[in-house]
Amino acid sequence: AHVLAAAQGGQLTATFQNGSSAPVQEVGQDTQADIAVVRAQGVSGLTPIQLGNSDTLQVGQPVVAVGTPLGLAGTVTSGIVSALNRPVETQGEPSPSQQQGQGGLSGLGGLGGLSGLSAAPQQQTPTSVLDAIQTDAAINPGNSGGPLVDMQGRIVGLNSAIASLGSGGGGQSGSIGLGFSIPINQAKRIADELIASGHATQAQLGVSVRDSQPNGAQLVSVAPGLAAAKAGLQAGDVVTKVGSQLVENSDGLVAAINSADPGSNVTLTVTSGAGAPHTVPVTLGSVPAS
């Protein structure tokens, strides 16, 4: 979605492998999930890429990233899945004139939330927390929206963000082996909704949270009548797992809920006060995505 936001004058054009191009029209976008759908005008006979299953990915599995980094069309880089379910706070892609750095985090959609790094200067656009696939396949500005592909040629993620250390003098440093992709299963659900109605929904827990020590996400407030309240959760409770996924901090809980299907059932592992951890089944709500 941040690629559309960065389009100069709102003019969108798709360029295909054979060198032909066509104007494209926006079908819809979900800026929080950083997903957009566009439709190429007057084009037929295209062969779509096969979709993989991001739920079956394993750490260490080989993958390749495809895109147009720094304007170099058709670039393919290889690597592995470095981590799964990585909470990543992203922000829209800066224009070339804004990609001057001073150290810190920058990216395809700037990226925040990694200890010791600060956000690089860029145009302010909505931020979101992704439940991302981390890869060391080289990804650079211009890779946004390009596929992360497994060894069977199936797309398993959409490249969305990188961590990059600014060069300090002018210009932006390239890949340092920390790239992040949106899992394709999540992207497909959102894309299907955008195609059907032009709008997408997202799961809602109905809480505000903060980091808990030594780990977990503490509920600061619980909204009456929403999913968490209906499940009996209370302010002060600490969530340490969503299903089998560990929650290390507040971003981890936000990312896990953002990646869940609206209306789905999840099991939270919760600690209340000095009590022992216990599980709480929750039926997530559904709200329109931004």
Walk through the language-model features, giving the residues of each:
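Extracytoplasmic/periplasmic mature domains of Sec-exported, cell-envelope-associated bacterial proteins
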Residues: 1-290
